[in-house]
Design a protein with these regions (language model features):
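Eukaryotic scaffold/interaction segments
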Residues: 2-804
Length: 804
C-alpha cells in the first residue's frame, strides 16, 4: 500500500501516482488515480463483494488455510469499508462468522471430547482461536482504530475472546465439566496421584485471559469452587490429623500442606490464588483448632515446655503466627504454665521457701528456661518477653519473703569462700539476679535487708572483694538511682574512715603506753542512719578485758570528736580467741580453758561490738592443743564464762551475759550443735533444740586439723516471724513518711488536684520503691490535712489544695 498516510486521500482533488484498489482484490498495473474531495457512496454490490472476500479470508484463517492470502489486500478492503461508513456491517459480520465457527465446529469438537482428552482438546481449540484472532485483528486493524473507538465497543481480539467464553467455555455442560475436571485433578494430586499439571495450568491461564481486564471468569468458574472444595477437604483432614497425631506431628503436617498448596498455586494456578488457598488451609487446619492444638494432652504447649521441646515450640510459634490471635493463644498457654510453675516455687509449702539461696536459684533457673524458649522458640517476640516479665512480677511478689531472700542470695554470692566460681561467673549470676530485682514491687524492703547483709560482710570482712561489692551497688544505682544507694555508699565510706581512725589509735596506744590487757582491738565507727543498727542500746555484759580496751578507744575518739556519742553494737562484732584444750575430760578433773585472745570490735554512732579474752589454766590435763577460734562477739561472751566455771546452765549463761534470748540461742546452737569439728561446747541433754534447762561445758575432746577454726554461726535462712514482723513494721513506718513527702512534692508543684489524680501520681512516683495502696495514700492525705499541709476545697471535698 503506497499511500503516504490515510489522510492523503482526503486532501481534495489532487493527482498522486499510486496503485488502484481493484474491486475484487486483483492487482493491475499502475495508472494515475484522481481522488476527488467528496467521496462517492460505494455501490451496495461492491460492498457485498468486499465483505464476501473478507468473510472468506476469515473462514480460511479459522481453517488454518491462510498461506495463500494477501494480508495487504485484505487490510485495504477492510479499510475501504470502514472509510465508507460500513464499519458496523464489518463488525457485525465478523461477530457472526466467529460465533458460527465456534458454535458449529469448535464447540462440537469439545463436546465430543468430554470423556476423552477433554483438557487437551479444549486447550488446542483455545490456542487455535487465539492464533486466528491475532491474524484477523491484523486485517481489521483500521476498524479497531476507528470504528471500535468511535462506538465504544470491544476490539476485534477481545470480541473473539468474549465469543469463545460464551459459546465454548461457559456453554452448559462444558463449563461444569471443566470445573469438575480441574477440581478432580487437584483432589487426586492431594491424594498423592500424578496429574498433568501443564493441562491445569493452560486451563487456568485461559480462564484468566477470558476475563479480559479482570479475574471474574477465573474466579467464578474455578477459584471460588476450588477454595470451597479445599475448605471441605481440609476440614475433614484436620479432624483426621487431630485424631491420629500428636501436636508436634500435626504441626509438621500442616506446614507440609501449606507448602504443597503454595507450590501448587505457583506452578499451575494463577499467582493471585496462592494467598487465598493458603488462607483457607490456615483457617481450617490452624485457626479453627488453635485451642485444641495448644492444649493437647501429652503433646501440647505444656508438654513441650515441660520437656524442653524447643524446636517443636518454634514450629508452633511460626505456624500460629500465620493466623490472627494465633500468637496470643500460644502466649496465653505459655503464661498460664509459667504462672503455675512460679506459684509452686514461691508458695510456703515448697521446700525451697525455707532456703533463700535455693529459692532464688530456682527462680533464676526458671527464668533461664523461659529466656531460652524466648530466644530459640519465640523469635525474641517482644509480646512474649513482656509476658514473661509480667508473670515473674506476678508470682515473685506473691511471697513477702522475696525481697529478703533475694538479698540473702546476693549475700551468699558476695561472701568469701564461694567455691568453683570465677569473678566473671559471679558477675553473670548477679546480672541475672538484677533481672529478678526489677520485678520486685517492694524494693524498699529489699534495701533494708541488703543493708543488713552488706553490714555483716563489711564488718566481718567476709566480702569476696570490694570491687564486687561496689559493682553490685553500681547495678542497684543504675536501676534505682543514687538515692537508693546513698546509704550503701556511706557504709563503704565509714569503713575507709574507720581504718584511718584505727591507725591513729594504735599510734596513740604506742606513744601513751596504754594497757589494753592483751586485747588487739579493732573498731568500726558507724554513722547512724547508714547502718542497720538498733535504735535501743543492745543488752550485753562484755568481759572485762574487751570492755576496758573499748573504753580506751572511746576516750581517744571522743577527745578528737567532742559532742559525738558511741554506742556498742555487739550483734555486729566478732572475735578471735586463743584457745587451749588439754585432752579428753576425766570424771574427776576440770580440763579446758580459753586463753587470752585477740578481739575485734564494731562501734556505731551509739553502737559497737567487741570481743575480749581472759586467760586461765586448769591442771590434771594431757598434752595441750592450741587453736585460734573465730567467733561472734556474743559467742565470745559465752565462751569466756567457761574460764571461771566448769558447767553452766542456759539460764546462768543468760544471766551472766544478758544477751537477748534470740541471739543467745543462735550462739549456743553454733557452739554446741554445729559440725563435729566446730563443737567447742557439749550440751546435756542432747536434744534438738536449746532449752532453758540445758547444761553446757567445754568439749575437752575438741580437735581439729586446722589451727584457725571458724565457728559458723547458725545463719538464719531468713528472719524469724517476729523479726519479719518487726522489719515490716519499720518498713511501713518509713513508707508513711515517703508517701507524705511525695504528696507534698506533688501538691506544692500543682497547688490544686482531685483525689483520684493525686493518688495516681503518688503511686507512679513511688512505683520504683514500692506500690502504695490507695487506702494508705488516702490515710496519709487525711493526716496532712489534719496537720494543715493540705485543705479540701469548699465546693468539692474530693479536690485538695496546697497550704503554703
Amino acid at each position: 500500500m503506497d499511500y503516504q498516510n490515510e489522510d492523503d486521500m482526503r486532501q481534495g482533488s489532487r493527482v498522486v501516482q499510486t496503485h488502484t484498489i481493484p474491486a475484487l482484490g486483483l492487482i493491475h498495473k499502475s495508472n494515475p488515480l484522481i481522488i476527488r474531495s467528496t467521496l462517492t457512496t460505494m455501490d451496495e454490490k461492491y460492498v457485498e463483494s468486499i465483505w464476501a472476500l473478507l468473510k472468506s479470508a476469515i473462514q480460511e484463517i479459522q481453517k488454518k488455510n491462510n498461506s495463500g492470502l494477501s494480508f495487504e489486500e485484505l487490510y485495504r478492503n477492510a479499510y475501504t469499508m470502514v472509510l465508507h461508513k460500513y464499519g458496523e456491517r464489518l463488525y457485525t459480520g465478523l461477530k457472526e462468522v466467529v460465533t458460527q465457527h465456534l458454535e458449529n465446529k469448535v464447540r462440537e469438537d469439545v463436546l465430543r471430547s468430554l470423556h476423552n482428552n477433554f483438557l487437551q482438546t479444549l486447550n488446542l481449540a483455545w490456542n487455535d482461536h487465539q492464533t486466528s484472532m491475532v491474524m484477523i485483528r491484523d486485517i481489521l486493524m483500521y476498524m479497531d482504530r476507528v470504528y471500535v473507538q468511535q462506538n465504544d465497543v470491544d476490539n476485534v481480539y477481545n470480541l473473539g475472546l468474549i465469543i469463545f467464553r460464551d459459546q465454548v467455555v461457559r456453554y452448559g455442560c462444558v463449563r461444569d465439566h471443566l470445573r469438575e475436571t480441574l477440581l478432580g485433578m487437584v483432589a487426586r494430586e492431594r491424594r498423592g496421584e500424578v496429574v498433568d499439571r501443564s493441562a491445569i495450568k493452560n486451563a487456568c491461564q485461559m480462564l484468566m485471559l477470558l476475563g479480559i481486564n479482570n479475574r471474574q471468569v477465573y474466579e467464578e468458574d474455578f477459584e471460588r469452587p476450588f477454595l470451597q472444595q479445599s475448605a471441605e477437604f481440609y476440614r475433614m483432614e484436620s479432624q483426621k490429623f487431630l485424631a491420629e497425631n500428636s501436636a508436634s506431628v500435626y504441626i509438621k503436617k500442616v506446614e507440609a500442606r501449606i507448602c504443597e498448596e503454595s507450590e501448587r498455586a505457583k506452578h499451575y494456578l494463577d499467582e493471585s490464588t496462592e494467598s487465598r488457598i493458603v488462607e483457607v488451609v490456615e483457617e481450617e487446619l490452624i485457626k479453627i483448632h488453635m485451642k485444641t492444638i495448644v492444649e493437647m494432652e501429652n503433646s501440647g504447649v505444656v508438654h513441650m515446655l515441660k520437656n524442653q521441646k524447643t524446636e517443636d515450640l518454634g514450629c508452633m510459634y511460626k505456624l500460629f503466627s500465620r493466623v490472627s490471635d494465633g500468637l496470643r493463644t500460644v502466649c496465653d498457654c505459655v503464661s498460664q504454665f509459667l504462672r503455675e510453675q512460679g506459684r509452686a516455687l514461691v508458695q510456703e509449702e515448697h521446700e525451697s521457701t525455707t532456703n533463700a539461696v535455693l529459692y532464688v536459684q530456682n527462680l533464676l533457673d526458671l527464668k533461664d528456661r523461659f529466656d531460652h524458649f524466648l530466644h530459640y522458640s519465640f523469635n525474641n517476640d517482644k509480646n512474649y518477653k513482656q509476658m514473661i516479665a509480667s508473670d515473674f512480677e506476678y508470682f515473685l511478689n506473691l511471697n513477702p519473703k522475696s525481697p529478703e531472700y533475694l538479698s540473702l542470695f546476693i549475700d551468699d554470692k558476695l561472701k568469701k569462700g564461694v567455691k568453683g566460681m570465677t569473678e566473671q561467673e559471679i558477675e553473670g549470676i548477679l546480672d541475672k539476679t538484677m533481672v529478678l530485682f526489677r520485678f520486685l514491687q517492694e524494693k524498699d524492703v529489699f534495701e533494708r535487708y541488703y543493708k543488713q547483709h552488706l553490714a555483716k560482710r563489711l564488718l566481718l570482712n567476709k566480702s569476696v572483694s570490694d570491687d564486687s561489692e561496689k559493682n553490685m551497688i553500681s547495678k542497684l544505682k543504675t536501676e534505682c538511682g543514687c538515692q537508693f544507694t546513698s546509704k550503701l555508699e556511706g557504709m563503704f565510706k565509714d569503713i575507709t574512715v574507720s581504718n584511718t581512725i584505727m591507725d591513729e589509735f594504735k599510734d596513740h596506744v604506742l606513744t601513751s603506753g596504754a594497757n589494753l590487757h592483751g586485747v588487739d582491738i579493732s573498731v568500726r565507727v558507724l554513722t547512724t542512719g547508714f547502718w542497720p543498727t538498733q535504735s535501743a542500746t543492745p543488752k550485753c555484759s562484755m568481759p572485762t578485758a574487751p570492755r576496758d580496751a573499748f573504753d580506751a578507744f572511746r576516750r581517744f575518739y571522743l577527745a578528737k570528736h567532742s559532742g559525738r556519742q558511741l554506742t556498742l553494737q555487739p550483734q555486729l562484732g566478732s572475735a578471735d580467741l586463743n584457745a587451749v584444750f588439754y585432752g579428753p575430760r576425766r570424771e574427776e578433773s576440770n580440763c579446758g580453758g580459753l586463753d587470752t585472745p585477740s578481739s575485734s570490735s564494731s562501734i556505731g554512732n551509739g553502737s559497737s561490738t567487741s570481743g575480749s579474752q581472759v586467760s586461765q589454766r586448769s591442771s590434771q590435763c594431757n598434752t595441750p592443743r592450741k587453736h585460734i577460734i573465730q567467733v561472734s562477739t556474743y559467742q565470745m561472751c559465752v565462751l569466756m564464762l567457761f574460764n571461771k566455771r566448769e558447767r553452766l546452765t542456759y539460764e546462768e549463761i543468760q544471766g551472766e551475759t544478758d544477751i537477748p534470748e534470740r541471739d543467745l540461742v543462735r550462739a549456743l546452737q553454733s557452739l554446741a550443735m554445729g559440725k563435729a569439728t566446730q563443737r567447742i561446747l557439749l550440751k546435756h541433754p542432747r536434744t534438738k533444740e536449746i532449752e532453758s534447762t540445758n547444761c553446757f561445758c567445754v568439749n575437752d575432746s575438741f580437735t581439729s586439723k586446722l589451727h584457725r577454726v571458724k565457728i559458723q554461726t547458725v545463719a538464719a535462712k531468713g528472719e524469724s516471724e517476729p523479726e519479719r514482723r518487726e522489719t515490716r513494721n519499720k518498713v511501713d513506718e518509713d513508707r508513711k513518711h515517703e508517701i507524705e513527702a511525695a504528696i507534698v512534692r506533688i501538691m506544692k508543684a500543682r497547688k490544686r488536684m482531685p483525689h483520684n489524680i493525686l493518688v495516681t501520681e503518688v503511686t507512679e512516683q513511688l512505683r520504683g520503691r514500692f506500690l502504695p495502696s490507695p487506702v494508705i495514700i488516702k490515710k496519709r492525705i487525711e493526716g496532712l490535712i489534719e496537720r494543715e499541709y493540705l485543705a479540701r476545697t469548699p465546693e468539692d471535698r474530693k479536690v485538695y489544695t496546697y497550704v503554703a
